[in-house]
Swiss-Prot record:
Protein name, per record: CD40 ligand
PANTHER family associated with the record: CD40 LIGAND (PTHR11471:SF5), TUMOR NECROSIS FACTOR FAMILY MEMBER (PTHR11471)
BP terms from Gene Ontology: B cell proliferation; immune response; inflammatory response; platelet activation; positive regulation of interleukin-10 production; positive regulation of interleukin-4 production; positive regulation of NF-kappaB transcription factor activity; positive regulation of T cell proliferation
Species lineage: Eukaryota, Metazoa, Chordata, Craniata, Vertebrata
Keywords noted in UniProt: Cell membrane, Cytokine, Disulfide bond, Glycoprotein, Membrane, Secreted, Signal-anchor, Transmembrane, Transmembrane helix
Gene encoding the protein: CD40LG
Segments in the Cytoplasmic topological domain: 1-22
SMART domains from the UniProt entry: TNF (SM00207)
Keyword Cell membrane (UniProt): yes
């Protein structure tokens, strides 16, 4: 008699270990990413905090410096005469630098009090529209970057009354895109009353690097004294 024998099926391989490894790697990745983000945020916070501490320290030093000057002026004995003299010398140097910067800025902006000359495309006008344009009859605007020779001649009537003997000033000015206007060249000439209208000329010229969109123009102290005859007053530029 033959009996059947059922052999038990083999057990399936355990799959729990790979699943646990995947979960572990997933959690580890999240932890590392979180740590990196946290470290970056902490670095930004620390940088800003150090900047704030530096500003506070500078303000504290300025406050101590001003208090020391006050103590020197009141004649407190806690400070020696040598220390007070050195501190006062530093303070006077700071004030002098501030005043010099203010005077320089005033000189740079003084041309705003003058008047821009008007120009017309006549006479020996040879400007190329592909290179430069005359805008509003006042300024020449370049379209290409490069070195330019800029020139100007202003002829004016030098006869003046005795009550107004201020020199006639002509300024060649530059206005760059996104920047303030500044003076490139300036010249002055005194008036003369020996003739009914003695003609005098001022010549300005130089080589400058201009960016696309930069404009140049001429300012004078009194446009009513300018002689506009052909060849007397001119303004232009040449690309080198």
């Amino acid at each position: 008699m033959i009996e059947t024998y059922n052999q038990p099926s083999p057990r399936s391989a355990a799959t729990g270990l790979p699943v646990r490894m995947k979960i572990f790697m997933y959690l580890l990745t999240i932890f590392l990413i979180t740590q990196m983000i946290g470290s970056a945020l902490f670095a930004v916070y620390l940088h800003r905090r150090l900047d704030k501490i530096e500003d506070e320290r500078n303000l504290h030093e300025d406050f101590v410096f001003m208090k020391t000057i006050q103590r020197c002026n009141t004649g407190e004995r806690s400070l020696s005469l040598l220390d007070c003299e050195e501190i006062k010398s530093q303070f006077e140097g700071f004030v002098k630098d501030i005043m010099l910067n203010k005077e320089e800025k005033k000189k740079e902006n003084s041309f705003e009090m003058q008047k821009v000359l008007q120009w017309a495309e006549k006479g020996y006008y040879t400007m190329s529209n592909n290179l430069v344009t005359l805008e509003n009859g006042k300024q020449l605007t370049v379209k290409r970057q490069g070195l330019y020779y800029i020139y100007a001649q202003v002829t004016f009537c030098s006869n003046r009354e005795a009550s107004s003997q201020a020199p006639f000033i002509a300024s060649l000015c530059l206005k760059s895109p996104g920047r303030f206007e500044r003076i490139l060249l300036r010249a002055a000439n005194t008036h003369s009353s020996t003739k009914p209208c003695g003609q005098q000329s001022i010549h300005l010229g130089g080589v400058f690097e201009l960016q696309p969109g930069a404009s140049v123009f001429v300012n004078v102290t009194d446009p009513s004294q300018v002689s506009h005859g052909t060849g007397f007053t001119s303004f232009g530029l040449l690309k080198l």
